[in-house]
C-alpha cells in the first residue's frame, strides 16, 4: 500500500521546536532535529524557524542527511490586507522554496485567525468570512496559484483550526470558488478530526486536488478537556491535543487505502506539535515511522 515510486515520507520540525511557542523545544537545535529525522527513516521535512535562511547552507546540511525540503508554511492575509503585501512576501517565499527543490507551497489564510491567540477558546471563538472576504480570498489564492505555476509549483491550501477555512462547508466553499488548476488542498487529518469533520469524506471528495498530506493524531481525552475548559489552540497543544499517527484515536488505515486507490503522488508528512520535554521528538518520530511501516509496508 502506497506507491514508493510516487510517495515521499517526511516529518515536520514542529515536534522538536515550536515556531508559534518558541519556548517549546528551545533547547533543540536545527542539527539535532534533522539528524533525528534522518535517523528515524524519513526522507524530507518542512522548513522551521531554526533552519538556516541561506540556501547553500541549508542544502549542505540536508544533503549530508539525505533529506529534502517538501514545503514551508506561508501565512496569507488576503482578507485583511492589500493583496500586494501578500504577493510580495509570497514571491520571496516561493523563490526560496523553488531553490530548495520544493514543488508545493503550503498556504493558510491568517486574516481573522485565532490560532495564535493564547486566551481565545479554539472551539468557540472562530471567525466566519463574509461574502466579500470569501471573494478576496478566492481571487487572491488564484493569483498566488498562478505565481506558483510560473515556477512549476503548486499552492496547497491548509485548512486549520481557528481560521476562516476550518469546517467541511468552508473547505467546500473554498474549493468551489477557486480554480481547480491553480489552487490545491492540503489534507490534514488532525485538524479535520479536531473540528469534528469526517476526514474520509473530505479525502474521497477531493482526492484529485489533494497534493500534500499532514498526518497528525488526536488524543481524544485531551481534546475533550480543551472543549470543556475552553482552552485556546495553543494551550491545547501544550496539553497534548496532538500526537503522532498510531498514538491517538484516528484510524489511519482507510486513509492510506484511499490515498493509494487514488494514486496519490507527493509528500506525506508527520506533523504533530506537542511539548518535546514530555514527548521526546526522536522517540515519537520512531514511533510514527514504525506505525506507518506496519500499516503501509512503506
From Swiss-Prot:
Reactions mediated catalytically: scyllo-inosose = 3D-3,5/4-trihydroxycyclohexane-1,2-dione + H2O
Gene3D superfamilies with a match to the protein in the record: Divalent-metal-dependent TIM barrel enzymes
Pathway assigned to this chain's UniProt record: Polyol metabolism; myo-inositol degradation into acetyl-CoA; acetyl-CoA from myo-inositol: step 2/7
Pfam families, alphabetized: AP_endonuc_2
Record-level Gene Ontology MF annotations: manganese ion binding; myo-inosose-2 dehydratase activity
Domain of life the protein comes from: Bacteria
InterPro entries reported for this sequence: IolE, IolE/MocC, IolE/XylAMocC-like, Xyl_isomerase-like_sf, Xyl_isomerase-like_TIM-brl
The entry's keywords: Cobalt, Lyase, Manganese
Co-factor(s): glutathione; Co(2+); Mn(2+)
PANTHER family in UniProt: HYDROXYPYRUVATE ISOMERASE (PTHR12110), INOSOSE DEHYDRATASE (PTHR12110:SF41)
Family of the protein in this entry: Belongs to the IolE/MocC family.
Full protein name: Inosose dehydratase
Species whose genome carries this gene: Clostridium beijerinckii (strain ATCC 51743 / NCIMB 8052) (Clostridium acetobutylicum)
Amino acid at each position: 500500500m502506497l506507491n514508493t515510486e510516487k510517495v515521499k515520507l517526511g516529518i515536520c520540525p514542529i515536534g522538536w521546536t515550536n515556531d508559534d511557542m518558541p519556548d517549546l523545544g528551545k533547547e533543540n537545535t536545527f542539527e539535532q532535529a534533522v539528524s533525528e529525522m534522518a535517523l528515524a527513516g524519513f526522507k524530507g521535512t518542512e522548513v522551521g524557524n531554526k533552519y538556516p535562511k541561506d540556501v547553500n547552507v541549508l542544502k549542505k546540511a540536508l544533503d549530508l542527511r539525505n533529506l529534502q525540503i517538501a514545503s514551508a508554511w506561508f501565512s496569507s492575509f488576503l482578507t485583511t490586507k492589500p493583496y500586494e503585501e501578500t504577493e510580495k512576501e509570497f514571491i520571496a517565499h516561493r523563490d526560496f522554496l523553488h531553490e530548495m527543490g520544493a514543488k508545493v507551497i503550503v498556504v493558510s489564510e491568517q486574516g481573522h485567525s485565532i490560532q495564535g491567540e493564547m486566551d481565545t477558546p479554539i472551539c468557540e471563538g472562530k471567525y466566519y468570512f463574509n461574502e466579500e472576504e470569501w471573494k478576496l480570498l478566492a481571487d487572491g489564492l488564484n493569483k498566488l496559484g498562478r505565481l506558483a505555476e510560473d515556477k512549476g509549483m503548486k499552492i496547497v491550501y491548509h485548512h486549520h483550526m481557528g481560521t476562516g477555512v476550518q469546517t467541511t462547508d468552508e473547505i467546500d466553499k473554498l474549493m468551489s470558488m477557486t480554480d481547480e488548476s491553480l489552487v490545491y488542498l492540503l489534507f490534514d487529518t488532525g485538524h479535520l478530526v479536531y473540528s469534528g469533520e469526517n476526514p474520509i469524506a473530505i479525502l474521497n471528495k477531493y482526492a484529485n486536488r489533494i497534493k500534500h498530506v499532514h498526518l497528525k493524531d488526536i488524543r481524544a481525552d485531551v481534546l475533550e478537556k480543551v472543549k470543556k475548559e475552553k482552552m485556546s489552540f495553543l494551550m491545547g497543544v501544550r496539553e497534548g491535543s496532538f500526537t503522532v499517527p498510531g498514538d491517538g484515536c484516528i484510524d489511519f488505515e482507510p486513509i492510506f487505502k484511499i490515498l493509494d486507490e487514488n494514486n496519490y503522488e507527493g509528500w506525506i508528512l508527520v506533523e504533530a506539535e506537542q511539548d518535546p520535554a514530555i514527548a521526546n521528538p526522536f522517540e515519537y518520530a520512531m514511533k510514527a515511522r514504525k506505525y506507518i511501516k506496519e500499516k503501509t509496508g512503506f
